[in-house]
């Protein structure tokens, strides 16, 4: 039986893309992932993640990373919620892997609903397989199922690569891109002041953080 895991990296940041990773492996060989030492990607150092990502790709029967740019996220948010966007993205990765059993890290407060919605979305493109596939969704699935940990790792490594590329391309150091990062907040505030509340394409314009900065600049009359 072919099993797969899907997880995201970069759902919350205000800067940079979101990556959704998927890893597929024959269930009888899935113990290899445990032997490799995959764990929740957030608990690993960037170097260890990179090493593991290479090993995962070598041993997996299939893998795929979907990249969603800030502008794509902004456009989608005009017509759907973030939860609905996650369903569409997970389904797109599922289309590439087509396992017999999917373990998905729940991107919804209701894990069961998330699984149901993935099946519904997936049935639009793969109606027959959508009836057969077993989908198990749970919170922190990356800490329970090694195949989800593996998906989390390849997603995180790809997002980190893209963030570094953006920093080089723009000649900027905006920190991690997460709203809670002081360096990210400082970058956004300074950029907003210098560009009359307009932000570059690497920023998710629909994020509350950006709205807050725009409001703040309006109140202060955009003074440097």
From Swiss-Prot:
Primary location recorded for the protein, binned into one broad class: cytoplasm
Enzyme class: hydrolase
Gene Ontology cellular component annotations, sorted alphabetically: cytoplasm; ribonuclease H2 complex
Molecular functions per Gene Ontology: manganese ion binding; RNA binding; RNA-DNA hybrid ribonuclease activity
Reaction(s) catalysed by this chain's protein: Endonucleolytic cleavage to 5'-phosphomonoester
GO biological process: DNA replication, removal of RNA primer; mismatch repair
Cofactor: Mn(2+); Mg(2+)
PROSITE patterns (UniProt xref): RNASE_H_2 (PS51975)
Entry keywords, A to Z: Cytoplasm, Endonuclease, Hydrolase, Manganese, Metal-binding, Nuclease
EC identifiers of the protein: 3.1.26.4
One Pfam family from the record: RNase_HII
Domain of life of the organism encoding this protein: Archaea
Subcellular location per the Swiss-Prot or TrEMBL entry: Cytoplasm
CDD domains on file: RNase_HII_archaea_like
Domain RNase H type-2 as annotated: residue spans: 1-219
Cofactor binding comment, as recorded: Manganese or magnesium. Binds 1 divalent metal ion per monomer in the absence of substrate. May bind a second metal ion after substrate binding.
Record-listed a divalent metal cation binding positions: 7-8, 105
Function, in words: Endonuclease that specifically degrades the RNA of RNA-DNA hybrids.
Annotated family: Belongs to the RNase HII family.
Name recorded for this polypeptide: Ribonuclease HII
Species of the source: Methanosarcina barkeri (strain Fusaro / DSM 804)
């Amino acid at each position: 039986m072919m099993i797969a895991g899907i997880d995201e990296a970069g759902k919350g940041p205000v800067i940079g893309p979101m990556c959704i990773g998927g890893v597929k492996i024959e269930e009888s060989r899935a113990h290899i992932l445990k032997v490799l030492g995959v764990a929740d990607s957030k608990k690993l150092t960037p170097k260890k993640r990179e090493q593991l990502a290479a090993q995962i790709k070598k041993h997996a029967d299939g893998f795929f990373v979907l990249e969603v740019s800030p502008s794509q996220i902004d456009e989608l948010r005009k017509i759907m919620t973030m939860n609905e966007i996650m369903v569409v993205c997970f389904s797109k990765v599922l289309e590439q892997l087509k396992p017999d059993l999917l373990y998905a890290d729940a991107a919804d407060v209701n894990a069961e609903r998330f699984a149901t919605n993935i099946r519904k979305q997936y049935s639009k493109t793969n109606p027959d397989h959508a009836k057969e596939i077993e989908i198990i969704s749970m919170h922190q699935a990356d800490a329970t199922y090694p195949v989800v940990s593996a998906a989390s790792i390849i997603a995180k490594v790809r997002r980190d690569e893209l963030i570094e590329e953006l920093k080089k391309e723009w000649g900027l150091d905006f920190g991690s891109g997460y709203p809670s990062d002081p360096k990210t907040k400082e970058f956004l505030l300074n950029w907003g002041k210098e560009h009359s509340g307009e932000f570059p394409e690497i920023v998710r314009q629909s994020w509350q953080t950006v709205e807050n900065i725009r409001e703040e600049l309006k109140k202060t009359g955009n003074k440097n």
